[in-house]
């Protein structure tokens, strides 16, 4: 078997090798059933066990109270940009929601919600600014909470707590009451830092995460919603995307992505075995500090994000001489460092160092960064 490269993809991303090995070992025969998980009825006893166990493990990892429903859905984070407003805007006589726009994904969330109601921007990082005497370009900073303007009659306030492309991260979420809107629930897209650190989900009415970054393979989306927010879907909402239906049938209202849920459940067990979410946080802090420390000490590379809001998961950086980009990527692949190219909307490079990336992978990247700088600096 060839040595596995270090995979820095933003998603679908690297999975823990132990999870892949277990899935491979059980591919043809899950626990003596004689069937692959891919062949099981989603209503049969075997898959019901898999699905219920995954939910129980997730609840344990997050310390979720009973008044939150857990749903394993389809459509990805982008799909939730439509599913959320179709489910929550019906809470108000006039469909409306507010958005904190801090990058690519929250911009798309705001735009999509506008198809279903009045979507307004409560705060934005779309313009350049100056912070602590340092110039910050658009999408490299976060608007202070005291500048947010939230309507008291909004159905919800949306934010993306980790912008995968821009590499900015909210470490804390505000209490809507502190914004003068105590009846406006917080909706948070946590896709790219889900399970990477403790999150105060009790402050949110709903969170969602595409699994393909920290929680599993592409194809399943985790939605965690306070139960009092269910049952308000707009008439236009398809029944399969109505949270009330999905929650009532324990994620089996229609055929769910069974194999993706199974693998995700294995990831949950892997996280539990490695110290839970606190264990992930400690490892992720160490990786991020190591990588940012090197970038900040280099005159050859640069990370554009305001240091106080840098993501631990997604680290964008640019070469001072962009004419070297292609050579950098070719050399990285030859060294076994894969998928470092930045998103097409911003260019440059990006290292996504999710839970499954060990410290050794980050050190291998830094070793390559040093060598490339030595040869081209």
From Swiss-Prot:
Q: Does the keyword S-adenosyl-L-methionine apply?
A: no
Record's catalysed reaction(s) = O-phospho-L-serine + 2-oxoglutarate = 3-phosphooxypyruvate + L-glutamate; 4-(phosphooxy)-L-threonine + 2-oxoglutarate = (R)-3-hydroxy-2-oxo-4-phosphooxybutanoate + L-glutamate
Q: Which cofactor does it need?
A: pyridoxal 5'-phosphate
Give UniProt keywords alphabetically: Amino-acid biosynthesis, Aminotransferase, Cytoplasm, Pyridoxal phosphate, Pyridoxine biosynthesis, Serine biosynthesis, Transferase
What GO biological process terms are annotated to this protein in UniProt? L-serine biosynthetic process; pyridoxine biosynthetic process
The catalytic activity of this protein is classed by the Enzyme Commission as 2.6.1.52
Q: Which residues form a coiled coil?
A: none
Name of the featured protein: Phosphoserine aminotransferase
Q: What species is this protein from?
A: Bordetella parapertussis (strain 12822 / ATCC BAA-587 / NCTC 13253)
Recorded name of the encoding gene: serC
